[in-house]
């Protein structure tokens, strides 16, 4: 008799995706982040669900409802901090996952890559709207600043901003709709993640060497299930340490001050995971130019397959490209640091140089380095 997991209509899908899936035998720990992202998403949906049971999306009670969750609800504080720091872990895994895709040339699976970019934008939108919900100072002013960027769109900009606000400023209508969207979007992310996997399983996984691994595949279970469990345990360990020992480490103290439209905080800045994009936005003195640079800083990923000039897929055997990749990582860390600094003399210049370098590496230096490496191979 055939095993039920191979015949049952539902079990068959799970079996072909997570149990008997033929997987390259040489994929490294960098391939763990997909499953870690899945764990983060489930964690966020579950903690978010329990938070939504006690949260009220009204400007007069939103802040106090979050305080109530932390003080009066059984284990409410841990649910709230798991959700807040879970978002940080989510973005760490996301950036590692995208970085691995860039390093090993996974963007040549164009469908999977493009769905991934849509996923990235959706998760960013979800996180932004979630940050508005506690209705602290940084929530309110962050929402005001970021939604205001849309007013840079010619002709329809101002109308669009007021349409999103549901009035002439960020107010009750804005908070209510942001809560509605913040609740629904994770399920959209979940659906997109399934499509992402669907496209990935059409081609099979990439591997560090970048060459086809059809001749050397092993079943996903038990080899990679056990490897993923190790990654998951490390993720849970870091998250637990963060939540139990310094839950506010990555947050902004200004968000413990209730939103006040009459008092602007000295430094308006988003959560740490958006600082690199915020630095790129601020580095351009023109409003529309800044908004375009902000969008392009992520959208540039979509043209990576077109910029791939190398004869090899990954960077495993390409030292010049490797140096440029790590320069890009250092540049992004610099941008993240600059995004959190005030708009003053040395920071402005550093931010502008780092922004130029970011686009230079991706658009100019990496394709040229690949061509040079191709020529070196001929010798």
Swiss-Prot record:
Compartment(s) where it occurs, according to its Swiss-Prot or TrEMBL record:
Mitochondrion inner membrane
Q: Which GO terms describe its cellular component?
A: mitochondrial inner membrane; respiratory chain complex III
Q: Which UniProt keywords apply?
A: Electron transport, Heme, Iron, Membrane, Metal-binding, Mitochondrion, Mitochondrion inner membrane, Respiratory chain, Transmembrane, Transmembrane helix, Transport, Ubiquinone
Named cofactor requirement(s): heme b
The source's superkingdom equals Eukaryota
**How many and how are cofactors bound here?**
Binds 2 heme b groups non-covalently.
Question: For this chain's UniProt record, which GO biological process terms are given?
Answer: mitochondrial electron transport, ubiquinol to cytochrome c
**Binding positions for heme b b566?**
97, 196
Q: Where does a ubiquinone bind?
A: 201
**Segments passing through the bilayer:** 33-53, 77-98, 113-133, 178-198, 226-246, 288-308, 320-340, 347-367
Task: Provide an example Pfam family for this protein.
Answer: Cytochrom_B_C
Which residues bind heme b b562 per the record? 83, 182
Topology with respect to the bilayer? Multi-pass membrane protein
InterPro entries reported in the protein's UniProt record: Cyt_b/b6_C, Cyt_b/b6_C_sf, Cyt_b/b6_N, Cytb/b6-like_sf, Cytochrome_b, Cytochrome_b_C_euk/bac, Cytochrome_b_N_euk/bac, Di-haem_cyt_TM
Q: Does the keyword Ribonucleoprotein apply?
A: no
Enumerate the GO terms in the molecular function aspect. metal ion binding; ubiquinol-cytochrome-c reductase activity
Q: Which family does it belong to?
A: Belongs to the cytochrome b family.
Q: How does it assemble?
A: The cytochrome bc1 complex contains 11 subunits: 3 respiratory subunits (MT-CYB, CYC1 and UQCRFS1), 2 core proteins (UQCRC1 and UQCRC2) and 6 low-molecular weight proteins (UQCRH/QCR6, UQCRB/QCR7, UQCRQ/QCR8, UQCR10/QCR9, UQCR11/QCR10 and a cleavage product of UQCRFS1). This cytochrome bc1 complex then forms a dimer.
Q: What else is known?
A: Heme 1 (or BL or b562) is low-potential and absorbs at about 562 nm, and heme 2 (or BH or b566) is high-potential and absorbs at about 566 nm.
**Its biological purpose:** Component of the ubiquinol-cytochrome c reductase complex (complex III or cytochrome b-c1 complex) that is part of the mitochondrial respiratory chain. The b-c1 complex mediates electron transfer from ubiquinol to cytochrome c. Contributes to the generation of a proton gradient across the mitochondrial membrane that is then used for ATP synthesis.
Q: What is this protein called?
A: Cytochrome b
Q: Which species is the source of this protein? A: Pusa hispida (Ringed seal)
């Amino acid at each position: 008799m055939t095993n039920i997991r191979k015949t049952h209509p539902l079990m068959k899908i799970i079996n072909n995706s997570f149990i008997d899936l033929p997987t390259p035998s040489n994929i490294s720990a960098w391939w763990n982040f997909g499953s870690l992202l899945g764990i983060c998403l489930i964690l966020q949906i579950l903690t978010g669900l329990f938070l939504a049971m006690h949260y009220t999306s009204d400007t007069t009670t939103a802040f106090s409802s979050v305080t109530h969750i932390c003080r009066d609800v059984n284990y409410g504080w841990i649910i709230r901090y798991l959700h807040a720091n879970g978002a940080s872990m989510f973005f760490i895994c996301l950036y590692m996952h995208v970085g691995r895709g860039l390093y090993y040339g996974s963007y040549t699976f164009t469908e999977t890559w493009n769905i991934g970019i849509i996923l990235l934008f959706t998760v960013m939108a979800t996180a932004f709207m979630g940050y508005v919900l506690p209705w602290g100072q940084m929530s309110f002013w962050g929402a005001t600043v970021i939604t205001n960027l849309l007013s840079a769109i010619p002709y329809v900009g101002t109308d669009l901003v007021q349409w999103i606000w549901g009035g002439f400023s960020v107010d009750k209508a804005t908070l209510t709709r942001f809560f509605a969207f913040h609740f629904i979007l994770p399920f959209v992310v979940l659906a997109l993640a399934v499509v992402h996997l669907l496209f990935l399983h059409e081609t099979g996984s990439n591997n560090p060497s970048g060459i086809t691994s059809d001749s050397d595949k092993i079943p996903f279970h038990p080899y990679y299930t056990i490897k993923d469990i190790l990654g998951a345990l490390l993720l849970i360990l870091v998250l637990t340490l963060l939540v139990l020992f310094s839950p506010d480490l990555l947050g902004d103290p200004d968000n413990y001050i209730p939103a006040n439209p009459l008092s602007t905080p000295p430094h308006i800045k988003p959560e740490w995971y958006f600082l690199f994009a915020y630095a790129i936005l601020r580095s351009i003195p023109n409003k529309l130019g800044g908004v375009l640079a902000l969008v392009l800083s992520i959208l540039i990923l979509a043209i990576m397959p077109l910029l791939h000039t190398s004869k090899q897929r990954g960077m495993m055997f390409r030292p010049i490209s490797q140096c440029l990749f790590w320069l890009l990582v250092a540049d992004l860390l610099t941008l993240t640091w600059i995004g959190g600094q005030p708009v003053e003399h040395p920071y402005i210049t550093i931010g502008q140089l780092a922004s130029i370098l970011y686009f230079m590496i991706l658009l100019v230096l990496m394709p040229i380095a690949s061509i040079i490496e191709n020529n070196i191979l001929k010798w």
